Amino acid sequence: MKPYLAQARSWASLLQHYGCIKKQHMRDLFAADPQRFDKFSLIFNGILFDFSKNRITEETLKLLLDLARERELQQGISRMFAGEPINNTENRPVLHVALRNRANRPIMVKGKDVMPQVNVVLERMGKFCDRVHRGQWRGFSGERLTDIVNIGIGGSDLGPAMVTEALQPYAKSGFRVHFVSNIDGTQLAETLKTIRPETALFVISSKTFTTQETLTNAHSARNWFLRAAPDDKAIAKHFIAVSTNRSEVEKFGIDPCNMFEFWDWVGGRYSLWSAIGLSIALYLGMENFEQLLEGAHEMDKHFQETPLKQNIPVIAALVGIWNINFLGAQSHAVLPYDQYLERFPAYLQQLEMESNGKHVTRGGASVNYATGNVIWGAPGTNGQHAFFQLLHQGTPLITADFLASAESHNPLGEHHQILLSNFFAQTEALMKGKDEAEVRAELEEANLAKGEVEALIPHKLFDGNRPSNSFLFSKLTPWTLGALIAFYEHKVFTQGLIWDINSFDQWGVELGKQLATTILPELQGGEEVNSHDSSTNGLINYYKRIRHL
């Protein structure tokens, strides 16, 4: 059994090392070593990962790699790929990697190779998408189905929604895709205003097919549809299920022949590679969905086979642990300089925060070190005019990932070069900052009075020394996106192994759902509620007083 993390020898060495270098500025590290970029950057199949703008030295990296070895990282990676039940609180394997196992090597679960099942579902998806795209699968009116409506929440929504937006340039001509996740009826109502029952194809995505939000939205969508359809039989042409629960799918009224399955060893936030990605394949075409899988598979091989020192997910995870546990960063911004990646930060919020937002070890002991951090972000350059002020001059230490492509899908004049000039400038500014001498020289050059110069200097100082990573790739393609998503998955897994937490359960989402089940019947009628604390009682009772005003 591994020792408690804070008792690990390498952890103590890192603490001592931090004490020695905590006041070093990255400006000086770059000035002292012209080869710093070469030493602290890696390239994977054309994707550049630059981590040189972090407050690390070669000794830091050596000690972090020692930590990874002491925490038996390589063995943990092998256990996941071997199909061992590493999700220990649910006694399940974690095999999203099997879903994109393009080499088709056997992956065993309880003595049975899962790959034949995976391949059958992929083949069914391909045939179904082909029929829809060719117009062979038509609606009750005989019209082609052109509006794909994905109804799901969490992993059944965030991944497919992010991927379809990111890869819009690859969309099938004549098709639109819509996503409904929120129980707030507004989202479904506004979506239904934009489509026609005759051309709508609803994909109901729910692992259990009992998720309250998804089933409520699905029933409302069905009721809307049946008001236009000739009879219940029309449902068979317009409603598809993606689930593990055949009986609940049948109970809803969907023909099991129209159900695409996946398995309990696929976690929700890791499920876009499965039949949950059906809306992706319908919108982009199966060939592009398979390219997404190919990119992820290549990153899987890199993660599994590459020595730790050249292993991009491992290095990113270790640098993240350094920033979180030693520098004290509690917030991490994801900043894609690509409008198509607008949903990428929201996708990573679930991936990282639901995976590693844990307060006990795998063995149930309380941790006394930080695990995970707050993930957020927005596309550049929008963020520069909104929250970058805090990144540059605020008191919290906020680390960041910058992502950009060298080539735009929409080359308009100098737009892309201007975009990338900002991408490069922001990472340099966060690292370098601007000291008093530079500020003073600028102000004096502007011919300001001496008193005005002195008054403005503190406001125009940039401390710099703010850590960031940069990802630069040729073009945002299905393959590239697949590799990037898999990179983040493996980074999260690596950090979970180091912290000795289970990155694959999510018990933290349960309590609120349980309480909501209790509260829902209390919202009926006009009786005053007094079964909760005074704040919750007060909120419920005020709602009941004003709801019909």
From Swiss-Prot:
Primary location recorded for the protein, binned into one broad class: cytoplasm
Compartment(s) where it occurs, according to its Swiss-Prot or TrEMBL record: Cytoplasm
Keywords of the record: Cytoplasm, Gluconeogenesis, Glycolysis, Isomerase
Enzyme class: isomerase
Annotated disulfide bonds: none
Biological processes, Gene Ontology terms: gluconeogenesis; glucose 6-phosphate metabolic process; glycolytic process
Pfam families according to UniProt: PGI
A GO CC term assigned to this protein in UniProt: cytosol
Molecular-function annotations in GO: carbohydrate derivative binding; glucose-6-phosphate isomerase activity; monosaccharide binding
Coiled coil: none
Catalytic activity reported: alpha-D-glucose 6-phosphate = beta-D-fructose 6-phosphate
EC code: 5.3.1.9
Keyword S-adenosyl-L-methionine in record: no
Active site per the UniProt annotation: E354 (proton donor), H385, K513
Pathway(s) where this gene product acts: Carbohydrate biosynthesis; gluconeogenesis; Carbohydrate degradation; glycolysis; D-glyceraldehyde 3-phosphate and glycerone phosphate from D-glucose: step 2/4
Function: Catalyzes the reversible isomerization of glucose-6-phosphate to fructose-6-phosphate.
Family statement: Belongs to the GPI family.
Annotated NCBIfam families: PRK00179.1
Protein name: Glucose-6-phosphate isomerase
Gene behind the chain: pgi
